[in-house]
Structures are given as C-alpha cells and as structure tokens.
Amino acid sequence: MAKLSKKQKNQAASVDSQKLYGVDEAIALAKQNATSKFDETIEVALNLGVDPRHADQMVRGVVTLPKGTGKDVRVGVFARGAKADEAKAAGAEVVGAEDLLETIQGGTVDFDRCIATPDMMGLVGRLGKILGPKGLMPNPKLGTVTMNVAEAVKAAKGGQVEFRVEKAGIIHSGIGKASFPAEDLRANFDAFVDAIVKAKPTGAKGKYLKKAAVSSTMGPGVKIDVADVAGA
C-alpha cells in the first residue's frame, strides 16, 4: 500500500470518516480539500437501493445543472444538410455523416457528447462497439437522437449531464468545479439528486437513496447524512 503524502494526511485529518455531514458542510469540506494546482471537479456519489441487472431497476437519464458544469464540452453531431448547418451554428465542434463515421472508425473520437438526427442512426449504429463503451451512443430517451439538433447542442454545452447507475448500485457525476461558490455547488447537487429521485424505477424496493458522499477530484470522500438530502 502506497504511503500517504503530507497533503493527503492533512486532507484525511480534516474529514471524520465515521461522521455523516450535512450537505452544506460536506460541500465546504470538499472545496477545502481541493488543493491541487488545477481546478478540481466536485463530484457526488450516491448508493441506490437498486440492482441494475434487472431491467425494471435501471436508473438512467439526463439533468441540466442550473449553474453549469464548468467544463468545456465538445459536441459531435451526425447530420446532413440544413441540420448539419444548424449544429455548426449552435456551436458543435464536430459535424458530419459518412466522413465522421470514417474518422471515428480510424480511431479518432474528438468529442464528449454525441448527437444524431434520426435518419443518421443506421450509420451511427455501425459505431456501437466504439461509442457504446465510451457512453457516447446517441439515445432518443436522453434527447440525443433528435431533429432539434441546435437545442440538443446548446443543452449539452449548457450544463446538461447524463447519468446511469453502475453494477453496484452506484451513480455519480461531477456537479461543478472547486472554484464555484458553495451555493452554486449546492444548487447543482440538489438538481442532480432531484433528477435521481424522479428517475426512481418501478422495480426499486425498500430504501432508494441509501448513501451519499461528495469529494474533489484528488480529495477524500465526505459522507453525507441522507436525512439532509431533499427527496431522500
């Protein structure tokens, strides 16, 4: 086991690993422990009472964080003609059809979100083995297969994040940067949790929101008292 650095020891000492903190105090501690030279992301992790191996217990969706993510999101769009022009005008960095297919098949995936018009899905489907594992496959349920490409591009760049529960019932997301004011991080935290609560699947039994924590990219996790979480 690697030795902890002095900075890591100081960070660990500032957080009581046995204590459940209120949301505001937890966010303040996560910000306090974001001491790297880069602007660390503040992340939230939730442990849900679901088993995603069952189709009726899958938790997936999108949410727009009201204060944005602080990230520069590159958007790729599969579209032709006027819809391709709309995507470019809305700020999409990568727009194309067969040419974009060939670029991706050649090993270059130069975007963080992928949007497609419905008529492009036959083409995009051939990229499933490349885009799927990266979480980039356009999906009509997530609003990324649409004729409203301009709106989708602006949403992707304006603070919209996708979420999907993992095998152990964990769901996580960045909710902003450490440089954000604490109240902005709280607003994003509340919006994210609210979306998760609204996405509660029909097959979920017992307690839904079991555990919660926040952390910075390089900092320790700060456990949250779920009784202090709206909608828990």
UniProtKB/Swiss-Prot annotation:
- UniProt keywords, alphabetically: Repressor, Ribonucleoprotein, Ribosomal protein, RNA-binding, rRNA-binding, Translation regulation, tRNA-binding
Q: What Gene Ontology molecular-function terms does this entry list?
A: rRNA binding; structural constituent of ribosome; tRNA binding
Q: Does the keyword rRNA-binding apply?
A: yes
Q: What GO CC terms are in its UniProt record?
A: cytosolic large ribosomal subunit
- Any Pfam family from its record, for instance, is Ribosomal_L1
GO annotation terms (biological process): regulation of translation; translation
Kindly state the subunit structure of this protein.
Answer: Part of the 50S ribosomal subunit.
Question: What's its job?
Answer: Binds directly to 23S rRNA. The L1 stalk is quite mobile in the ribosome, and is involved in E site tRNA release.
Q: What's this protein's family per the entry?
A: Belongs to the universal ribosomal protein uL1 family.
Give the protein name, as stated in the record.
Large ribosomal subunit protein uL1
Please name the source species: Rhizorhabdus wittichii (strain DSM 6014 / CCUG 31198 / JCM 15750 / NBRC 105917 / EY 4224 / RW1) (Sphingomonas wittichii)
Print the organism lineage: Bacteria, Pseudomonadati, Pseudomonadota, Alphaproteobacteria, Sphingomonadales
